Amino acid sequence: MIFDVHVHLVGMNPESGCYVSPTLSTGLIYYLFTWELGLAGVDQENVDEAYRDQLVTWAADSDLDGVGIFAFDGVYDDLGHYDHERTSYYVPNEFCFDVCEYSEKLFPVASVNPMRRDAFDELERVSEAGTVALKLLPNSQGVDPGDRRYEPFWRRVAELELPLITHTSFEHTVPALDQSFGKPEKLRPVLDQGVTVIAAHCAGSGVAHPFEEDFGTWLAMLEDHPNLWGDISAMASVSRFPYIHKVLQSELARERVVLGSDFPVPVAPMVFSPQLGWSKARELSQIENPLQQNLEVFRALGVDDGILHRGGELLRLPDGVGD
């Protein structure tokens, strides 16, 4: 099955338990977000439902067989208490599970910050509820994956056979508390506990950080860690487009990556005009469904079926799905 493992859920209505900081929910960022999704003019209290309905429609109308939908845990202090002041973005696991009930193509990816006091209890709860993986964005959630205090947590994640989809390298959208937490080498203690780790963006630092590269570290780590993978999310966007070429040029990388989009990050087909030609890039730009557009851009660039299908093989899908 063709599986996009990397799609973000957006919720802004406090009644759903979601939270987006004023930095992200006002001004230019919010305008561009709503305009890109066709949600301009939708009241913020109605954005949750409108975004959900768009996701359901786009997934149904795409060639994708499955889409991993992310919850997003908040920031926690050293005592394990939720830190609202430092949290920029929060999507509760329960909200994520509820949204995924609207389509058989949507699969919940829960988020559990290992710093929270009830981390083990929440991990067990979401595992029992059917999460197919866990999501972490260390830079913005204030989590150092290399901190050995969390090894028992990661050990339990491995026992539950839940893969971890974690952001790597620099974060560009959600305000970062510590960019060093995204370094791929920080994942070694997690990998050593036996967790299957999917490094989002293959640790590509992005065009904004051309002299601070982490992709090579991730690529080298593949040799030592058979449970380390990567996803190609955002590699069809302006921010990380050079990295799809790096992945496709490496036989090892091609064998260890899965499909992702990083939706709602916009796809930018025109940046691939030198490879695809202006006419083909323009044709891809006309695709209105962003999930399908991301898929078609990667197909045009030579992403093979192994990459497109591999994500579903790594996730802990319900029995009978994908058979």
Where are these regions (language model features)?
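An N-terminally biased module of ancient metal coordination in phosphate/nucleic-acid-related enzymes
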Residues: 1-71, 76-87, 305-323
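Hydrophobic faces of well-ordered beta-strands that scaffold small-molecule active sites
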Residues: 3-7, 67-69, 107-110, 132-136, ...
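Active-site beta-loop-alpha junctions enriched in small/polar residues
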Residues: 8-10, 72-74, 111-115, 137-141, ...
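Short, flexible/disordered intra-domain loops and linkers
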Residues: 19-22, 37-45, 76-88, 173-181, ...
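Active-site mouth loops of central-metabolism enzymes
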Residues: 36-49, 106-116, 144, 209
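Well-ordered, non-membrane alpha-helical segments in soluble/globular domains
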Residues: 41-55, 86-98, 180-185, 212-218, ...
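Active-site gating/metal-coordination segments in enzymes
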Residues: 73-180, 244
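H/E-rich (His + Asp/Glu) clusters that bind or coordinate divalent metals
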Residues: 204-323
